[in-house]
Swiss-Prot record:
It is found in: Cell membrane. Member of the two-component regulatory system NarS/NarL involved in gene expression during aerobic nitrate metabolism. Plays therefore a crucial role in anaerobic survival of mycobacteria in host. Functions as a sensor protein kinase which is autophosphorylated at a histidine residue and transfers its phosphate group to the conserved aspartic acid residue in the regulatory domain of NarL. In turn, NarL binds to the upstream promoter regions of target genes to regulate their expression during aerobic nitrate metabolism. Changing residue 241 to Q: Complete loss of autophosphorylation. The gene is narS. This is Sensor histidine kinase NarS. It comes from Mycobacterium tuberculosis (strain ATCC 25618 / H37Rv). It holds the Pfam family HATPase_c. It is a multi-pass membrane protein. It comes from the Bacteria. The lineage of its organism: Bacteria, Bacillati, Actinomycetota, Actinomycetes, Mycobacteriales. The keyword Transmembrane helix applies. Its EC number is 2.7.13.3. GO terms for molecular function: protein histidine kinase activity; protein kinase activity.
Length: 425
């Protein structure tokens, strides 16, 4: 049996042959929301197809005398389907779509699923001896099967089954034509389809929990890696400050004293300039490894100093817009993200200008870092993570663990990264 480290010690369960950690509710909700948004979008597209099938069923399978009320019903459903489609894709960027989806909760998808049940059941009731409208109702379990909540799916499927029974029993022409044995068989077949859809939802729910568990484990491992890296950086910074930097400062002081005794020696002047440059570089290195200013005066000045030193070193024009007058427990996380993003701008973007904005909105720390370089997307970062580059991915994991979000936003040129974190005072 392989060892899973903290996962095994903290407790977990096997799902699909994988040991999954007992996932936090926040991580589970995050993954469930993402899956629910995906399912909601798929269902909104399928609804358009259902509208087309309803029109076809009306034309080939119902009497012309029933068309007026059916057209009205199909028209209402078409409007609802288009509305659902617009809501599902109203935000072109996944971040804002997901945030809107979180704010609306579970009511919107449930409401449209209820509309599906009512409209398709009504369509069958308006169709005398219509086998095709009855076949359209088979699509209901398919739409419900895209859900990720077993309880909600069970309620909807039960209502769907009742609607199917009402539609069949409410058509006396069909009852006389097929008789009770075939009616019972059709009901049993539909019940089987509903049960199958419920099992699919259950499997999807378990899959969601598995993904959430693995995501939480990955975040934990990345956070541990970052913590170890920060400890190492602090030790290196202290070693540089207490060792080489002090030696350089001492040597520079001796040269200053020598220059006072024997002024005018150009070699001494060049040595002093070199030692001055070396001491500044060492101070900058210790600042980036362990920013004392972050502990002394706060995140805002630390970010401003980091941007200024990065601009001076790289030649990139970096503007700052900082309105962050408080201190918070998330400050080290935010500073680490800024440091990593500016490092990526210098190393990979080829940008000539960049901007850093830091502020507070709705009790959240909001960070925006943008540049005019070659551009980086979330897919690019995922590929780099697969290649072993965990820098930004580890910071994203820490942001997620703190209840925040780090996303790449669409921009005509360059890269735009937005970070939101709830404040911890």
């Amino acid at each position: 049996m392989p060892s899973y480290g903290n996962l095994g010690r903290l407790g977990g369960r096997h799902e699909y042959g994988v040991l999954v950690a007992m996932t936090s509710s926040a991580e589970l909700d995050r993954v469930r929301w993402a899956h629910q948004l995906r399912s909601y979008r798929i269902a909104s597209v399928l609804r358009i197809g259902v509208v087309g099938l309803m029109v076809a069923a009306m034309v080939v399978g119902t009497s012309r005398s029933e068309w007026p009320q059916q057209i009205v019903l199909i028209g209402v459903y078409a409007v609802a389907a288009l509305w659902a489609l617009l809501l599902a894709y109203s935000a072109s960027r996944r971040f804002f779509a997901l945030r809107r989806f979180r704010s609306m909760g579970r009511l919107e998808p449930f409401a449209f699923t209820a509309v599906d049940v009512l409209i398709l059941t009504g369509f069958q009731l308006l169709s005398t001896d219509g086998i095709y409208p009855l076949l359209i109702m088979i699509l209901l379990p398919v739409l419900v099967g895209l859900d990720v909540s077993t309880r909600r799916a069970a309620v909807v499927l039960a209502c769907t089954l009742v609607g199917f029974a009402v539609a069949v029993l409410g058509d006396p022409v069909m009852l006389r034509a097929i008789g009770w044995p075939e009616t019972i068989f059709r009901f049993a077949l539909y019940a089987f389809l509903c049960a199958t859809a419920l099992m699919v939802v259950r499997i999807e729910e378990r899959h969601t929990r598995s993904v959430a568990g693995l995501s939480a484990l990955r975040a934990e491992l990345l956070a541990q890696t970052m913590t170890a890296s920060e400890v190492l950086q602090r030790r290196i910074a202290e070693a540089i400050h207490d060792g080489p930097l002090q030696d350089v400062l001492a040597a520079r002081q001796e040269l200053i004293e020598l220059d006072a005794v024997t002024p005018g020696d150009e070699r001494v002047g060049r040595a002093l300039a070199g030692l001055q440059s070396a001491s500044e570089r060492l101070r900058q290195a210790t600042f980036e490894l362990h920013p004392a200013v972050l502990e002394q005066v706060g995140l805002g000045p630390a970010v401003k100093q980091l941007a200024a030193s990065t601009a001076q070193r790289s030649g990139i024009k970096i503007s700052t817009d900082i309105d962050y007058p408080i201190r918070s427990g998330i400050d080290p996380i935010v500073f680490g993200v800024v440091r990593e993003l500016l490092s990526n701008v210098v190393r990979h973007s080829g940008a000539t200008t960049a901007s850093v904005r830091l502020g507070i909105t709705d009790e959240k720390c909001v960070l925006d870092v943008a540049d005019d370089g070659v551009g980086v997307t979330g897919d690019t970062m995922a590929r780099r993570l697969g290649e072993g580059h965990i820098g930004l991915a580890s910071h994203r994991a820490r942001v997620d663990a703190a209840g925040g979000v780090l996303v790449f936003l669409a921009t005509p040129r360059g890269t735009h990264v937005c970070v939101e974190l709830p404040l911890k005072r």
